[in-house]
Amino acid sequence: DMVRPGIILYGYYCDQVNRNYIEKNNINLNLKPVMTLVSGVCSVRNFKKGNSVSYGHTWTAKKDTDIAVIPIGYGDGFLRRFSSVVKPAVNGKAYPICGRICMDQCMIEIGLNNSDVKRWDRVVLFGSKEAGALCDAQDIADATGTIPYEIMTGITKRVERVYIK
């Protein structure tokens, strides 16, 4: 006999039907996401009320604030449609993405004079809660009408992989 575990090796159910069956029958597989997408703050910039960021200036500062720039974007597989879905975590706190995710970067609003967020701080975009993520690939898939496979396999070769035993 053989088994093809597929995406369960990554800590996710293969489809909604199986997920519903497992939850309905109170089966605890204790799945945990094994992939976490992490970046860092490359700069913190002050924005005056009325200044805009991103393509099409879709976000405008409602008051004076600071923006942290994160060097990851849709060229890395962190897609534009994640802009309103993912809340990156810095030091355990969620921050909203400002505007649209760009090809090579995205921005988060951190608030004026926020000493909790500094250049080089670790930013957890999605993955395991143990790694500090506030959402996982299933959460993003549910919110964007896709499957976790697409979220995880979409991360491009530009993103360094670090394997942990």
Question: What kind of region is each of these model predictions?
Answer:
Residues 1-165:
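Active-site anion/phosphate-binding pocket segments in diverse small-molecule metabolic enzymes
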